[in-house]
Amino acid sequence: MAIEFGDHSSGFHHTEVIRFINNEVLKNGGSSEFYTTFRSRSWNEIEDQLRTILVDPKVPRSLKRACTWSALALSVRVAARQRQQQARRVWRLQDQVGEHESASWTLVSELQRLREERDQAAAQLLCTQIILQEAMDEREILRGRLLQAKRSALPVVPERGMEYGKTSLLSFEEKELGDLEFIGSQNMSHLEAQIPILSCLPGLSSPWVQAMDPFLQMTMAHPVPLKAKFSLEFSFSTPVPCPALMDSEATATAMITGLPQIAPSGIQPSSLCVTLESQETIASALDQICPRQKECSEILQDVSHLADSISCCEGEGPEKPQGTSLHGDSSNNSHKDNQAIPQIMAATEKKNLMMHQGTAAVEVNSNHSIKEEPVMPKGISSQGNKTSSTKKKRPKISRRVVGLIESISHNTQCVSVTPQETHTQVNKTTSTLKTYPGNLLRKPDQGKILSCNQKEDSKTLQRLTDLGEGTRNCQKEDTFQQTTCLNAGVSPNEKKMPQGTGKNQSQRQKEEPNSFQANHPRKCKSYLMNKYPKIQLATKQRVKQPEGIKSLESKQPQETKSSESKQQEKPLSHRTSANCICPSSKTVNRSWYKGCYKCAKTSA
């Protein structure tokens, strides 16, 4: 039989179908060989074998029918087998789907966990950013507090320049005090009423140099009468002394009564002596100082360059007589242009070594000026009248001169010159006068011509009267040793001066108004010798004086008296509401004096 009953893999479930198929195979002469041979093969192979049998003509028809029924039963079997295979495949696929689903669920849970972690990380990051911002803000606050604490804890450190200035000032104070003690013993015999005003303040409480308030420039009368003999009168502002440095409380009280008010923070500046120059020289000095202030940003550098230029003038000798006046006027006008002159003069006094060379050059220039225009206090009086006439022609320059002298009067300095320097100056002056005697014939009748100008303009003479008071104050502060020596050196040659060229000189004054440019050599010399005597005094303090100098000092008072007596032959008398001039002694007396205190004292 071809198909077995109960074979589930055959694909047939009913036995009637299986019996019918078996009977048909058997009736046609077939057997179960074809079914059994192709039972495990695929349908394609079964179909190919059936085609071969059906095409073969040698196979009987009944056999072909039996093979066809066996192939039909095999097709059902193949279908059943495929169904089973597909069922298993489906089961397998289902298993895979389940597995995939379980994997997806696992991934979903993992994804959810990662999302939660991400959210937590984002929240933590946000919190961290907030905390960081708060920390940065707190750091800035603490940093500001720390900087504020450091600023409050830092000490006030002065600048290097100020520290050097303080050290130099202290060392200069010690030298100056020693010099003043040494000179005071020599000059006390020549001073009847000396006002002690030092050029600097010792013991500054602060290293910082305080700026001095500008002075109130005004014409005031000095409360103490002075003994110096001057025919000219200058308007001035009384210099301010330091009460702590006065020799006595009485002198300090007398000085303070006539002083202008000064701010308490001001520092007494280094002083200058008044030097009266011709108006042309002062105008040229003003022109000289203006471009210098434009070129240099600090006036201290101007003073340094000025010291270098004076050092260079030492080798040129008397060929440049106008350098001294320009130098003095440049320094004086610096105070007018800039109220910071105390710091400048303090720095100038620090450079005394360089200024010593400049002083030597100034001595030579002053001697050359004496060679051309040798005049005594009478000549100074005539020069004052010449200044009055010049003020009429050039009122602007006159006002500049008055303002200049008023500014200079705040800077007067009480200094001295050693006998060695005086002896050197006398020798130079005497030799120069002998070498050029022809130039001494210029000034005999100058007083007459210029006294007429005083009568023409009483207002100008009153201004000169006030100006003379300033000169008397300034030269009273200077030691009389220098003035005595200079006058003694010039007077022997002035005795030999002929008197026949006065008219020629008056004509020359009309033609050449600039001829009086070097008219005050003694004032130029005394100004610069008073300005820079420190190094000379320090170097010559311990040197013994030669015998010739001592003998010269003994002769100086007599020669001074003789020269002054000759100069007083033509007195200049004038009286104003503020003061009066004695005709005999040419002494300026205050309005409250009934007579001349000098004549009364001399007669007594």
From Swiss-Prot:
The lineage of its organism: Eukaryota, Metazoa, Chordata, Craniata, Vertebrata. Residues 544-572 have a biased composition (Basic and acidic residues). It comes from the Eukaryota. Plays a role in transcriptional repression. Residues 314-337, 374-397, 485-523, 538-580 are annotated as: Disordered. Residues 322-333 have a biased composition (Polar residues). It comes from Mus musculus. Keywords: RNA-binding, Transcription, Transcription regulation. PANTHER family: TEX13 FAMILY MEMBER C3-RELATED, ZINC FINGER PROTEIN. The keyword Transcription regulation applies. This is Testis-expressed protein 13C-1. The gene is Tex13c1. Belongs to the TEX13 family. The keyword Transcription regulation applies. It holds the Pfam family TEX13.
